[in-house]
Amino acid sequence: MLAKRIIPCLDVRDGQVVKGVQFRNHEIIGDIVPLAKRYAEEGADELVFYDITASSDGRVVDKSWVSRVAEVIDIPFCVAGGIKSLEDAAKILSFGADKISINSPALADPTLITRLADRFGVQCIVVGIDTWYDAETGKYHVNQYTGDESRTRVTQWETLDWVQEVQKRGAGEIVLNMMNQDGVRNGYDLEQLKKVREVCHVPLIASGGAGTMEHFLEAFRDADVDGALAASVFHKQIINISELKTYLATQGVEIRIC
């Protein structure tokens, strides 16, 4: 059995790490490189960086901080933000990133997933899916351009359909960003994760809602996700990664202990 992964997420805007609640009202957390270094030293398995306004601004991720992160950490890291072409992806990988993640650009042009997978290999192509639960209809819908509140829109895709579509097109991993849960720290949406797990045959990463160590355990044990991504609990030092991993190991979760 492959070890489960603990993945801190760093949302980047204007060269700094920020964090919002349900993708809104972002506050500044701190500088990118020191945070990345701290998480690597605490025992994170991987880091994910989202330049949250790159897609809506029509630009690609800034090279300067990607290169600096690559210099100070020795764990894999994934970068997302405005990647719309093979050239964009090649640049970011050349800066030192191990994986690239696409989200809004994939919705605009789904063939991008296949072209990236063919060029760089499925192992480094992650598709992020921003999913919102509509209580009125009881359905999960995919959102686009969520880094900019003024441009965020609900797409025609239902989440389960899009999960299947991106796999057909070559996604090597899926990060499910559950917007309703984002930043509120009351647990991952296990119901949604279980439904997605049934149709997701590539590594699935849960994102949105972690507030306690038990929430991570539930995601691994009850929804069988491959990794759990979180931001607030790590940024605010509510949970220490090393202590979290020790706890999970005592609960029978296969995890890499540093």
UniProtKB/Swiss-Prot annotation:
EC number, UniProt record: 4.3.2.10
Domain of life: Bacteria
Amino-acid biosynthesis among keywords: yes
Reaction equation(s) it catalyzes: 5-[(5-phospho-1-deoxy-D-ribulos-1-ylimino)methylamino]-1-(5-phospho-beta-D-ribosyl)imidazole-4-carboxamide + L-glutamine = D-erythro-1-(imidazol-4-yl)glycerol 3-phosphate + 5-amino-1-(5-phospho-beta-D-ribosyl)imidazole-4-carboxamide + L-glutamate + H(+)
InterPro entries listed in its UniProt record: Aldolase_TIM, His_biosynth, HisF, IGPS_HisA/HisF, RibuloseP-bd_barrel
CDD domains (alphabetical): HisF
Keyword Amino-acid biosynthesis: yes
Pathway of action: Amino-acid biosynthesis; L-histidine biosynthesis; L-histidine from 5-phospho-alpha-D-ribose 1-diphosphate: step 5/9
Subcellular location: Cytoplasm
Name of this chain's protein: Imidazole glycerol phosphate synthase subunit HisF
Organism annotation: Escherichia coli O7:K1 (strain IAI39 / ExPEC)
Phylogenetic lineage: Bacteria, Pseudomonadati, Pseudomonadota, Gammaproteobacteria, Enterobacterales
Encoding gene (name): hisF
